[in-house]
Design a protein with these regions (language model features):
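Glycine-rich phosphate-binding loops of nucleotide-dependent enzymes
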Residues: 2-6, 10-256
Length: 256
């Protein structure tokens, strides 16, 4: 299924849903990110691209509270700088981690239900069914144990888990990893449908062409810093991205 093209105008209006200012993070004494500034508007898809080891996954973990960080993270007008993963989820910021492991001995249905901890009764069941509806390939196996799913289908299950709480911002780290081309399009189509329903998405994706077709804006990350911010409908974007990856000056302002 084809993904929808981005709008010709940015979706972000007014105050951003997510605002990251001066964020630095790493692992122990090893610094990875340096002074990251980033914004995402409500209902906007933003692609985060960069070479291997640029710090993309680290940035998502820092935003969601999985890693210690310095700087400021504001979400929905609330200061989340000191918040941990649970506080982030409760606020509507959900992070689907790359390589997320599902509970293989539980059914597909029960895996999705577990993601709705704290919810009860018919509301939870409704949310589970709504999440599975995005992925018919696993919905038809709802009563099968997750161990029977292919690796790509387990990745789809991980994304479905992230949808149960109807996040205001869904952060997807390499959602196409291990998927066939057909299933890649299924996941990215689901992302487009979520955007159309008002959910913002921060997308780390190795399939650059597909990511740019889907996203409204793009940030390029290299050597632990943001080296490019642009709208995806800019004519010179491929050239600017290539220069950004190799450390050349790409500081031209965004088109108005």
């Amino acid at each position: 299924m084809p993904t929808s093209a981005p709008n010709s105008t940015p979706r972000s209006v007014g105050e951003p849903l997510l605002k990251v200012s001066g964020l630095s993070a790493g692992y122990g004494k090893i610094g990875v990110l340096n002074g990251i500034d980033l914004t995402i508007g409500a209902g906007e898809i933003v692609a985060l691209l960069g070479p291997n080891a640029a710090g993309k996954s680290t940035l998502l973990k820092a935003i969601s509270g999985l890693l210690p960080r310095t700087g400021t993270v504001t979400f929905g007008g609330q200061d989340m700088s000191k918040a941990g993963p649970r506080e982030a989820v409760n606020a509507g910021l959900v992070h689907v981690v790359e390589g997320h492991r599902v509970f293989t001995q539980l059914s597909v249905h029960d895996n999705v239900m577990l993601a709705g901890y704290g919810m009860k009764g018919s509301e939870l069941e409704t949310r589970v069914e709504e999440a599975l509806r995005f992925f018919p390939e696993i919905a038809e196996k709802r009563n099968d144990r997750a161990v029977t799913l292919s690796g790509g289908q387990q990745q789809m299950l991980a994304v479905a888990q992230g949808l149960v709480r109807k996040p205001r911002l869904l952060m997807l780290d390499e959602p196409s990893a291990g998927l066939s081309p057909v299933l890649v399009d299924r996941v990215l189509t689901a992302a487009a449908q979520l955007r159309d329903a008002g959910t913002a998405i921060l997308l780390v994706e190795q399939l650059i062409e597909k990511a740019l077709k889907l996203a409204d804006r793009v940030y390029a990350l290299a050597r632990g810093s943001i080296v490019l911010e642009a709208r995806t409908n800019e004519d010179d974007l491929p050239n600017r991205l290539e220069h950004a990856y190799f450390g050349q000056d790409v500081s031209a302002p965004l088109a108005s």
